[in-house]
Regions:
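N-terminal segments that cap or nucleate solenoid repeat domains
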Residues: 1-59, 64-68
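Ankyrin repeat domain, specifically the short helix-to-loop turn at the C-terminus of the second helix
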Residues: 24-32, 57-65, 97-107, 131-139, ...
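Internal, charge-rich low-complexity segments
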Residues: 146-176
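Alpha-solenoid repeat scaffolds
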Residues: 32, 66, 83, 87, ...
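Charged, low-complexity interaction regions
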Residues: 177-181
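Ankyrin repeat A-helix N-terminal signature
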Residues: 10-17, 46-52, 79-94, 120-126, ...
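Ankyrin-repeat boundary/"N-cap" motif
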Residues: 2-11, 34-43, 69-86, 110-117, ...
Length: 227
């Protein structure tokens, strides 16, 4: 196992007993070393993917290139945005990591090939990170290979959430017609509350995008569809 693969595994399978080893690897692995088994990613890509602000700062202080690309053309900022997690408690650390990368020179429009970290953040519902990116002063109107800008993607996400809300409301309405355990009822209501909160986050992000003045609400994508 290469040191970079070991580092990735220590992040993916966190173990307090191996915390010292993780820190040792971060201090010893050359900042330009690449994991050929993981798309040529560096230790900075890995630290960003797991929103580890301390490690991000240490790698940059050691000379890591903030806009270094892996074999897929992804920069550390994009790897951060690509993290798939719907755990609310992780959203602020992700946003803080994005802010740190931007402060150290991360380029938003050129954060990936055929897409950007903003598009990816919106796709993965990282609204706090999206707010940081929107506030960065960098270009926001980039589109992906389908011509979709951040508003197109956000509106699709909002529509997905609306469908999930409708389905959950139908399920809750059926409680009076069939037996459903108290645990299932409680979980369904909690899930509905979270979906409704997500819907409001979509609206707030849309407002930020429109207020930026960089994205027109009637702009069409490659298929001729508006947001």
């Amino acid at each position: 196992m290469t040191p970079l693969r070991e580092l990735y595994d220590l992040y993916y399978y966190p173990n307090p007993a191996k915390e010292e080893r993780r820190r040792q690897l971060l201090a010893e692995i050359p900042t330009d070393a690449r994991d050929e088994e993981n798309y040529g990613r560096t230790s900075l890509h890995i630290a960003a993917e797991f929103a580890d602000c301390e490690a991000i700062a240490s790698q940059l202080d050691r000379g890591a290139e903030v806009n270094d690309r892996d074999e897929e053309g992804h920069t550390p900022l994009f790897r951060l945005a690509s993290r798939r997690s719907r755990v609310p408690a992780l959203e602020e650390p992700i946003a803080s990591a994005a802010r740190l990368l931007l402060e150290r020179g991360a380029n938003l429009p050129r954060s990936a090939r055929g897409t950007t970290a903003l598009l990816e953040a919106v796709q993965n519902r990282h609204h706090a990170m999206a707010a940081v990116l929107i506030d960065s002063g960098q270009r926001l109107d980039s589109a992906n290979s389908y011509g979709d800008n951040a508003l197109h993607i956000l509106c699709r996400r909002a529509a997905d959430t609306a469908r999930e809300i409708a389905g959950k409301e139908r399920f809750i309405a059926s409680f009076g017609e069939r037996w459903v355990s108290e645990k299932q009822q409680r979980e369904a209501r909690e899930e509905l509350e979270e979906l409704q909160a997500e819907q409001m986050r979509c609206y707030a992000t849309a407002a930020l995008l429109l207020h930026s003045g960089q994205i027109a609400p009637d702009e069409k994508n490659s298929a001729g569809r508006r947001a």
